[in-house]
């Protein structure tokens, strides 16, 4: 490695030029990376609902209704005018209202009340709209402009459009505040006014490279777009700081050596620690790649790539930048702003055993509670009632109740069997209406007598389409039970020869997919990190202690919603399990490394105090940065999935930090005879 680092130092101007060019190209590439805000797009291709949607899109021109629009204080003629105007909007492929089910020229009082009130109630008209995915942003905005602020719209298309528009501005706000905080914390923890700017420059270069190289994926998820950069900032913060501090140490130890020689020495001495730290983080992130739910691989690959690029930046760009600016660092040198943590170290040495006991007591209940949460699986609850979308959804449900749309595809022909299926589906209490050939044209009416535009919506491409309106949420026990019942009913008449699609159906498949991912992802993350530690430490007990400490922090973090009676987004639950392990196990590794170093010259208790004093600044810098980034995400994101992921990140960072600085010392103290190599050691006081 020394030869490589010597070459980097000698060609530092070329390195700076290459990174400057790469940063410019990355900025240009970032704008071309597409972001997907539809959570259902990340279902595995082989999931039943995904297959059903693909078959339906191949056979029919119209998709599944994905928006409900409520207009207040309108008459029937005015509602019909609104229907025509909505249908004329570019991107709207279909609009359904009362006139599609009943003859609205007949007085409504003389018609079926349930049918009428599904579309028109208390002077409010409810339209069921199908919006094309490619044009949903423009179409949703146009519908909003048409109906005005006093009316309401909700549905999957609206949720996706709102997420798209809000996340961009919110991420920019989070990033700006995070950078200011990181600058503040770096000013406190470094001894040069120039050093924080150098560290931020290096981090900025790595983040730009990661964002630009996301172009290789073509499209990234909204989770990756929102969390990727700020997570990279938080987990990579200490790499550059560590290198610069090593450089300062080498210059102080060998005052006669040139800055170039000191930098090569600093790189050689810091490579092992930085690489081991980065490797465990990468492994934790890569565990997400095994998820069938494709947001996992999407986020895992992007984060792992980000850490790798941060490491590349630290070992190439930062040496060149530091050598270009070290004179500026010398001129702006100042006394440390933070006090010594010696007293804190001695305090921890006194309380470490009780804290270790407390953690042992918490292990089992926190594990059980973390696995007993109630979950949201889909996108239905991503926006709370404090948002415009949440308020609109509540208003529509208050007037017209809940609603979802399922689409059943069965082979064309055999209208007698279709009629039997329709009759059976009508017996399901939650099914409030069915639009199909046998329901609207009649099983005895030949196809050639049905108008072409109507026929094309119901029969096409060898399939007959039955559109079910159901009184159900898009997720929850009731919704999932309904999906199972509809599937079982259709299975009776078309055994393994049908397709079922819909928002609730996709959410059911999401539940199936991501719950199956849980054990696999967690075991791989834990096993891989444990294996890396086993290879690094060359002993069994210490890796067990380190991994168990961080896993307990994860259990405590995920147990908090259980005790507060809150629902958890299962996607956030899965992601944080791997991310918290990968991002915070470094704290435990650093602590154990320094403890082993101090044990060469100090007794057990003194080594604990010295270790706490030595590492508190370092782990607090990274831990507090990650916590602030997480809490900012939780406070600013209107998307409740991203907000919850942020809060998990913030709480998890602080819990991991607290355990490493309070309970882990007690475990190391107790396990000392088994983890410290037998040497002639000082006698304990």
Q: Which residues fall in each region the model found?
A:
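Surface-exposed, low-hydrophobicity interaction/linker segments
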Residues: 35-37, 103-104
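Ser/Thr/Pro/Gly-rich low-complexity linker/stalk segments immediately outside membranes or between
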Residues: 36-41, 376-378
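Membrane-embedded transmembrane helical bundles of large multi-pass transporters/channels
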Residues: 1-35, 134-375, 493-685
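Structured non-transmembrane domains adjacent to transmembrane bundles in polytopic membrane proteins
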Residues: 45-67, 71-157, 374, 380-542, ...
